[in-house]
């Protein structure tokens, strides 16, 4: 998920 919403 660290690719488009939660960095």
UniProtKB/Swiss-Prot annotation:
GO CC annotation terms, alphabetical: extracellular region
Family: Belongs to the FARP (FMRFamide related peptide) family.
Biological role stated in the UniProt entry: Increases the rate and amplitude of spontaneous contractions of semi-isolated hearts. Increases the amplitude of excitatory postsynaptic potentials in abdominal extensor muscle.
Keywords, in A-Z order: Amidation, Neuropeptide, Secreted
Protein name (Swiss-Prot/TrEMBL): Cardio-excitatory FMRFamide homolog DF2
Source species of the chain: Procambarus clarkii
One GO term (biological process): neuropeptide signaling pathway
Lipid metabolism keyword on record: no
Compartments reported by the entry: Secreted
Residues bearing PTM Phenylalanine amide: 7
Origin: domain of life: Eukaryota
Cystine crosslinks: none
